[in-house]
Swiss-Prot record:
GO terms for molecular function: 4 iron, 4 sulfur cluster binding; 8-oxo-7,8-dihydroguanine DNA N-glycosylase activity; adenine/guanine mispair binding; DNA N-glycosylase activity; metal ion binding; MutSalpha complex binding; oxidized purine DNA binding; purine-specific mismatch base pair DNA N-glycosylase activity. This is Adenine DNA glycosylase. Changing residue 526 to M: Does not affect function in DNA repair. Changing residue 182 to W: In FAP2; loss of DNA glycosylase activity; loss of DNA binding; loss of function in DNA repair. CDD domains: ENDO3c (cd00056), NUDIX_DNA_Glycosylase_C-MutY (cd03431). The gene is MUTYH. Binds 1 [4Fe-4S] cluster. The cluster does not appear to play a role in catalysis, but is probably involved in the proper positioning of the enzyme along the DNA strand. The record marks 233 as: Transition state stabilizer. Changing residue 242 to H: In FAP2; loss of function in DNA repair.
Length: 546
C-alpha cells in the first residue's frame, strides 16, 4: 500500500466514526432589523463568546467554549461535521494560519500605518479608509487611491473639513461612489459629535457611524483596538466554507450566521487583528475562487474540502469501497442545510472549488442613454461642457456630459439631445451634431449603453456663462475632475474621432485602440507591487474582495 493510500485510508476510518446527534430546537426569527439593532445595543458591553453567532442547539462546539444565543435564530440544525471538534483543533488552526501570515503577508500601505501609528484614533481612521476602499475593489487598484487619500487627509479632522466635491474628485474612478460620501459623513460625526474619538468596539462602531456595517466594524475594532471579534468578507467566507465543507450558498441567512459564528470561534484573542487579516490574506492569495493553491495552504490538514477530494480520489481508484460519508453528515436530522445542495451534487472536476456553491446572480438590467461631448474654443485651449448629477441615486454628485434617455428613433434622439444641450449652453447648430459610437459600462446592477455624440462649436462666440450645475473645463481639468469611469470612456471615444488623434470607427465596450496599447494604471501597480509574490486570480465582494 502506497503512503498516500495508507494515509487516506486512516483518514477515511476516522471520518466514518459516528458523530454526536444534533438537536433540532427552534426559536422565532427576529421580527425586523430594528429589533436586531436593539438586541445588539443591549448586549454591546457583553464579552464576546467563543461561539458567538453559532446555533445554540449545536452540540459540536468545542468543549470549554461558551455558547451565546443567536441574534437571528434559525429553524435548522447543524451537524458537528461543519464545526471544529475541540479547542485543540481551533488552537491548531490559529497557530498554523498566523505562522503562515507572519512569513507571507503582503506589504501593504494600510498595514504599515496600522502597525506604526501610535494614536488610536488615527490608526482606526487609517484602517477605516482602507476597509471602505477595498469593498468590491481589487487591492492593486486601491493602493494608489489610498496613498493619495491619506496624503491629502491624514486625520479625521482633515477629512471632516473637506468639501464633498473634493472627496468625489479624489474618489473618481474607484467606483461605488457613495462609499466616499459616507466615509466623510462618518468623519464629520466623529469630529462634531464624538469629540474626535472613534468608537472603540465593533458594536458601537456599527451603531454610531454611517455606512459602517458588521464587517467593517469588526475589522476596525480588531485591527485598530485589539477587540477579539471575528469578521467575514468574501475571502473569509470562501476559506471557512472549504475548511468545514459548507457547500450551501454563503449569502443565505443560515450559512451567513454559521460563518460568522465560526469566525468568532476561531479569532485569536491575543492577535485578533492579525488573525482576521491572515484569514482574508489566505482567501485572496491561496484559497482563491478558481485554481486554489492547496499545496501552499497552511491549514490544508484541517480542510474538509481537501479531505473530500482525497476520499473521492481513493474511491475512483478503487482503493476504498462504499460511498462517501459526507452527504450523511447529519444522518439523524435529514438533509443537511450546509452541505452541497441536492440539485448541485459533487463535481469531480471542481475539487475543493465545489465549496461553496453560490446562487446564480440576477443579471443587471439594461438601460440606454445618449450623451454628447460639447466642445468650444477657450483661452487656454478647447473646453468641454459638464453638468452635475443629482445628489442622490446612481453616481450622485458626479459630473458628466449632458445626457438623455434613449429614444426609439434617431430623429427623436437628436432632438432630445439637442434640447438638453441648449438648456445648458443656449442655441446650438443642430447640423453639427455627430454620432461617434457607443460605450457599454456595467455598474453593480445596471448595464448602461451610452450612444456617444459630439458637437464642436467652431467660428462661434464662446459661451461664457452657464446655469448653476454646469461648467466648462479644459481637457486637463476634465481628467482630474469628479467624473465617473464611464464618462472617461465616453471622452476617449470622442477623442478618437477628432483630427490629429487616434482615429477609430464605431465601437462598444472599450474606447479607442490607442487607449489599449498601455496597461491600466491598476495593472501596472499590481505587476510592480507583487512581482515577487505568487500570482493569483482577481478577487471578487461580497464579494468583492476585494
Amino acid at each position: 500500500m502506497t503512503p498516500l493510500v495508507s494515509r487516506l485510508s486512516r483518514l477515511w476510518a476516522i471520518m466514518r466514526k459516528p458523530r454526536a446527534a444534533v438537536g433540532s430546537g427552534h426559536r422565532k426569527q427576529a421580527a425586523s432589523q430594528e429589533g436586531r439593532q436593539k438586541h445588539a445595543k443591549n448586549n454591546s458591553q457583553a464579552k464576546p463568546s467563543a461561539c458567538d453567532g453559532m446555533i445554540a442547539e449545536c452540540p459540536g462546539a468545542p468543549a470549554g467554549l461558551a455558547r451565546q444565543p443567536e441574534e437571528v435564530v434559525l429553524q435548522a440544525s447543524v451537524s458537528s461535521y461543519h464545526l471544529f471538534r475541540d479547542v485543540a483543533e481551533v488552537t491548531a488552526f490559529r497557530g498554523s494560519l498566523l505562522s503562515w501570515y507572519d512569513q507571507e503577508k503582503r506589504d501593504l500601505p494600510w498595514r504599515r500605518r496600522a502597525e506604526d501609528e501610535m494614536d488610536l484614533d488615527r490608526r482606526a481612521y487609517a484602517v477605516w479608509v482602507s476597509e471602505v476602499m477595498l469593498q468590491q475593489t481589487q487591492v492593486a487598484t486601491v493602493i494608489n487611491y489610498y496613498t493619495g487619500w491619506m496624503q491629502k487627509w491624514p486625520t479625521l479632522q482633515d477629512l471632516a473639513s473637506a468639501s464633498l466635491e473634493e472627496v468625489n474628485q479624489l474618489w473618481a474612478g474607484l467606483g461605488y461612489y457613495s462609499r466616499g460620501r459616507r466615509l466623510q459623513e462618518g468623519a464629520r460625526k466623529v469630529v462634531e459629535e464624538l469629540g474626535g474619538h472613534m468608537p472603540r468596539t465593533a458594536e458601537t462602531l456599527q451603531q454610531l457611524l454611517p455606512g459602517v456595517g458588521r464587517y467593517t466594524a469588526g475589522a476596525i475594532a480588531s485591527i485598530a483596538f485589539g477587540q477579539a471579534t471575528g469578521v467575514v468578507d468574501g475571502n473569509v467566507a470562501r476559506v471557512l466554507c472549504r475548511v468545514r465543507a459548507i457547500g450551501a450558498d454563503p449569502s443565505s441567512t443560515l450559512v451567513s450566521q454559521q460563518l460568522w459564528g465560526l469566525a468568532q470561534q476561531l479569532v485569536d484573542p491575543a492577535r485578533p487583528g492579525d488573525f482576521n487579516q491572515a484569514a482574508m490574506e489566505l482567501g485572496a492569495t491561496v484559497c482563491t475562487p478558481q485554481r486554489p493553491l492547496c499545496s501552499q495552504c497552511p491549514v490544508e490538514s484541517l480542510c474538509r474540502a481537501r479531505q473530500r477530494v482525497e476520499q473521492e480520489q481513493l474511491l475512483a481508484s478503487g482503493s476504498l469501497s462504499g460511498s462517501p460519508d459526507v452527504e450523511e453528515c447529519a444522518p439523524n436530522t435529514g438533509q443537511c442545510h450546509l452541505c452541497l445542495p441536492p440539485s448541485e451534487p459533487w463535481d469531480q472536476t471542481l475539487g475543493v472549488v465545489n465549496f461553496p456553491r453560490k446562487a446564480s446572480r440576477k443579471p443587471p438590467r439594461e438601460e440606454s442613454s445618449a450623451t454628447c461631448v460639447l466642445e468650444q474654443p477657450g483661452a487656454l485651449g478647447a473646453q468641454i461642457l459638464l453638468v452635475q448629477r443629482p445628489n442622490s441615486g446612481l453616481l450622485a454628485g458626479l459630473w458628466e456630459f449632458p445626457s438623455v434617455t434613449w429614444e426609439p428613433s434617431e430623429q427623436l434622439q437628436r432632438k432630445a439631445l439637442l434640447q438638453e444641450l441648449q438648456r445648458w449652453a443656449g442655441p446650438l447648430p443642430a447640423t453639427h451634431l455627430r454620432h461617434l459610437g457607443e460605450v457599454v459600462h456595467t455598474f453593480s446592477h445596471i448595464k448602461l449603453t451610452y450612444q456617444v455624440y459630439g458637437l464642436a462649436l467652431e467660428g462661434q462666440t464662446p459661451v461664457t456663462t452657464v446655469p448653476p450645475g454646469a461648467r466648462w473645463l479644459t481637457q486637463e481639468e476634465f481628467h482630474t475632475a469628479a467624473v465617473s469611469t464611464a464618462m472617461k470612456k465616453v471622452f476617449r471615444v470622442y477623442q478618437g474621432q477628432q483630427p490629429g488623434t487616434c482615429m477609430g470607427s464605431k465601437r462598444s465596450q472599450v474606447s479607442s485602440p490607442c487607449s489599449r496599447k498601455k496597461p491600466r494604471m491598476g495593472q501596472q501597480v499590481l505587476d510592480n507591487f507583487f512581482r515577487s509574490h505568487i500570482s493569483t486570480d482577481a478577487h471578487s465582494l461580497n464579494s468583492a474582495a476585494q
